[in-house]
A protein has these predicted regions:
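Conserved catalytic or metal-liganding residues and their short signature motifs at active sites
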Residues: 1-211
Length: 211
């Protein structure tokens, strides 16, 4: 009888384990389905999370703005995948019907929305700086303008909150690379001794043609 009792107890224990395992499998499957199912967002939405916005605040805003409808599940998935600390602040464009997985992947990868900022040819350095100061996507102050010809006129794609000084540095780096490429392919018969002379000449020509 004692042995029969132990067998019954062991059988009951195995049954409980089986039920628990089955429930876990079903729960995991349902959670995965929910993570990949189309979300509640009825149309594309642009949301901005300032620097140092924590995960609970991000989840709360995503829910209140109708991007997600299961913040607890998303929080749990981020934690289980070790990505809770990898969520990045910034401005994001969430697409219509974006799933929880879509939203998570975007936030973890930091795929922020980029704004187009066009700097046309013919502007002086001071005019370029004035355009950057007037652009409300950028942040931070600018002091004196760089020398003429050091900023590349181009269409730049910038994230909200990018510092104006960082963009100036990028414009200078891009211009330097372009000048180096042109200098390497220049006609040796042209009487220019340095890349700086090339930039100076280009600036003069640009000013004259822009009048």
């Amino acid at each position: 009888k004692s042995r029969d009792g132990l067998l019954s107890l062991f059988s009951a224990f195995l049954s409980l384990l089986l039920v628990a395992a089955l429930a876990a499998v079903i729960g995991f499957s349902l959670a995965q389905q929910k993570l990949r199912a189309p979300g509640p967002l009825a149309s594309d939405k642009l949301l901005y999370f300032p620097a140092r916005t924590d995960v609970p605040e991000i989840l709360s805003k995503l829910e209140s703005d109708g991007v997600i409808d299961a913040p607890l599940l998303m929080n749990l998935a981020l934690w289980l995948e070790g990505n809770r600390g990898n969520v990045k602040a910034g401005e994001y464009l969430f697409k219509k019907d974006a799933s929880l997985r879509d939203v998570m992947d975007m936030l973890v990868a930091g795929r922020v929305y980029l704004h187009a900022l066009t700097i046309p040819e013919g502007l002086t350095s001071e005019q370029i700086l004035q355009r950057l100061r007037e652009n409300d996507v950028l942040a931070g102050d600018l002091r004196e303008a760089p020398k003429e010809g050091l900023l590349l006129p181009e269409t730049y794609r910038v994230p909200r909150g990018m510092s104006r000084s960082d963009l100036i540095r990028k414009m200078q780096d891009d211009q330097r690379r372009l000048v180096d490429q042109i200098w390497a392919k220049r006609d040796p018969s042209i009487p220019l001794r340095t890349p700086h002379e090339l930039v100076t000449l280009a600036s003069i020509v640009e000013k004259e043609t822009g009048r």
